[in-house]
């Protein structure tokens, strides 16, 4: 295909470029416009061989090759929406059985066949999960739940004491009819464990039983799975080892909230499966995920030199930028390529929603540093319950603001991608998620990195664990009531550092008043500390 180069000063050339590059799929009702990204037909041609190799790798992944070398693990999120792709009959059957189990459980919760121990129907859900275990469900609920449909959802996705306190206290009048869902693949992630412990304590304090209203989503045989089994929790769902957190939205992690808000699981999975079929195509121009990956590649010179700003012009998709932030950055942010060469790859993602952002950072996007490209997301079909008043439709204005922002950026030579969806529902959300999952996989192949491990995340977890261990050692040391300098503590505890000790002590002394600093607070070198005993 030969198309004109990006030329904002020539309307005819730009119209020709737009028309040739516009991708459309009638089945989904989906358009992708990459015409305002700066690449040439020669650039795309130069990627064709690399793209074919990327497709081979993606095909091998779908057939069950080991993709996460660190954990010697398969990556099977594509099987979740088409169980026949799974490499074994046992896995295929397990996927189908799990989907049916989730459907039955959710329907029985909503129709009142499953109730609290007191015979009351469940009214609310408190979802406890971190990272993909929280972001996927949050996206599902925020984007798809209609008014007065299904259960009311709240989330504990952090270990902030103020946030936990505020959320738990918001349940006082409905605590007895709340379903508690705990998500942790390994069962050993500290954040959901801590949030669960606090929630259980809160229930106990209010005279309510935990097990009869608790659900676990975890890997079979994990510590959480064993707890749920031993304590006879209301229900357990499997999260297979071949599903990563950031791609777990089409697993039980996303399907359970779907059914609990009264949405159609099959429609969601069908949308993802349909996009999967489209994005297996070998022709770049007929593969929207390949077009996205190519746009990212040329925009950032294959090095992620430009940020991606995600601007969905729809309130219900406000969480989408956060969801993509994890999917893209955790997958592509890698220090080394697959040959252990230091490459420091990545693609930074941020965003919120239009038209709000037009009154925030779009000023810089148009007139400031040119280090980004925008991904607009547009939904064509407006809410029919909101009428025109004085011949003015909010939907018309929203569309006008999107097109105006796109043009204003383009006039100043700023790049953008526009994704347009005819109608937003569970089917098209599934397709949108699958679009970006495949784009991430293809882009990772183009830059030769492993998209399916997260050594940086693991390093952060290990460092946090070491800090908590150091805090325990400091607390034990200070039990004698003696006065210690920071230097003295460091010399007593091997492998510690002054800075870490100081930061731990500062937090301790502000939350446990038996710890007292002595000295000049503005100079940590002079401080001493002791515990009243």
Curated annotation (Swiss-Prot):
InterPro entries: G6P_Isomerase, Phosphoglucose_isomerase_CS, SIS_dom_sf, SIS_PGI_1, SIS_PGI_2. It is found in: Cytoplasm. It comes from the Bacteria. GO terms for cellular component: cytosol. It catalyses: alpha-D-glucose 6-phosphate = beta-D-fructose 6-phosphate. Keywords: Cytoplasm, Gluconeogenesis, Glycolysis, Isomerase. The keyword Amino-acid biosynthesis does not apply. The active site is at 330 (proton donor), 359, 461. GO terms for biological process: gluconeogenesis; glucose 6-phosphate metabolic process; glycolytic process. The keyword Aminoacyl-tRNA synthetase does not apply. Pfam families: PGI (PF00342). Pathway: Carbohydrate biosynthesis; gluconeogenesis; Carbohydrate degradation; glycolysis; D-glyceraldehyde 3-phosphate and glycerone phosphate from D-glucose: step 2/4. Its EC number is 5.3.1.9. Its main location: cytoplasm. One of its GO terms (molecular function) is carbohydrate derivative binding. Catalyzes the reversible isomerization of glucose-6-phosphate to fructose-6-phosphate. HAMAP family: G6P_isomerase. PANTHER family: GLUCOSE-6-PHOSPHATE ISOMERASE. Belongs to the GPI family. This is Glucose-6-phosphate isomerase. The gene is pgi.
């Amino acid at each position: 295909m030969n198309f004109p180069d990006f030329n904002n000063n020539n309307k005819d050339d730009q119209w020709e470029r737009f028309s040739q590059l516009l991708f459309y799929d009638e089945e989904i009702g989906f358009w992708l416009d990459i015409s305002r990204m700066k690449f040439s037909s020669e650039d795309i041609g130069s990627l064709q061989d690399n793209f074919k190799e990327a497709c081979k790798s993606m095909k091998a992944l779908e057939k069950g090759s080991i993709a996460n070398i660190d954990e010697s693990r398969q990556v099977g999120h594509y099987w979740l929406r088409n169980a026949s792709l799974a490499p074994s009959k046992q896995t295929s059957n397990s996927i189908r059985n799990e989907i049916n189990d989730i459907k039955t459980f959710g329907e029985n919760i909503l129709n009142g066949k499953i109730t609290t121990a007191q015979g009351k129907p469940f009214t609310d859900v408190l979802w406890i999960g971190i990272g993909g275990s929280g972001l996927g469900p949050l996206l599902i609920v925020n984007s798809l739940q209609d008014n007065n449909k299904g259960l009311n959802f709240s989330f504990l996705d952090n270990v902030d004491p103020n946030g936990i306190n505020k959320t738990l206290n918001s349940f006082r009048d409905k605590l007895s009819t709340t379903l508690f869902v705990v998500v942790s693949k390994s069962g050993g992630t500290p954040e959901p464990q801590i949030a669960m412990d606090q929630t259980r304590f809160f229930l106990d304090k209010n005279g309510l039983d935990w097990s009869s209203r608790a659900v676990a989503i975890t890997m079979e045989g994990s510590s959480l799975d064993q707890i749920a089994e031993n304590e006879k929790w209301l229900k357990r769902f499997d999260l297979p080892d071949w599903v990563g957190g950031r791609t777990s939205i089409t697993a039980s992690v996303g399907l359970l909230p779907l059914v609990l808000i009264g949405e159609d699981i099959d429609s969601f999975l069908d949308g993802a499966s349909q996009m999967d079929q489209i994005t297996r195509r070998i022709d770049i121009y007929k593969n929207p995920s390949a077009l996205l990956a190519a746009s990212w590649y040329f925009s950032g010179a294959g090095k992620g030199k430009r940020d991606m700003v995600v601007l969905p012009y729809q309130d219900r998709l406000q969480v989408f930028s956060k969801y993509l932030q994890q999917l893209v950055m955790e997958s592509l942010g890698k220090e080394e390529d697959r040959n252990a060469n230091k490459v420091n790859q990545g693609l930074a993602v941020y965003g919120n929603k239009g038209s709000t952002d037009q009154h925030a950072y779009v000023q810089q996007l148009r007139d400031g540093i040119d280090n980004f490209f925008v991904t607009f997301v547009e939904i064509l079909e407006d809410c029919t319950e909101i009428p025109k008043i004085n011949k003015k439709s909010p939907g018309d204005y929203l569309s006008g603001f999107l097109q105006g922002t796109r043009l204003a950026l383009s006039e100043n030579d700023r790049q953008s991608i526009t994704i347009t969806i005819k109608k937003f529902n569970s089917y098209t959300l599934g397709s949108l998620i699958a679009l970006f999952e495949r784009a991430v996989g293809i882009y990772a192949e183009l830059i030769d990195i492993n998209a399916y491990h997260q050594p940086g995340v693991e390093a952060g977890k290990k460092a946090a664990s070491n800090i908590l261990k150091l805090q325990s050692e400091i607390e034990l040391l200070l039990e004698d009531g003696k006065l210690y300098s920071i230097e003295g503590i460091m010399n007593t505890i091997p492998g510690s550092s002054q800075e870490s000790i100081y930061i731990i002590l500062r937090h301790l002394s502000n939350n446990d008043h038996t710890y007292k600093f002595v000295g000049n607070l503005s100079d940590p070198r002079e401080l001493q500390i002791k515990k009243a005993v």
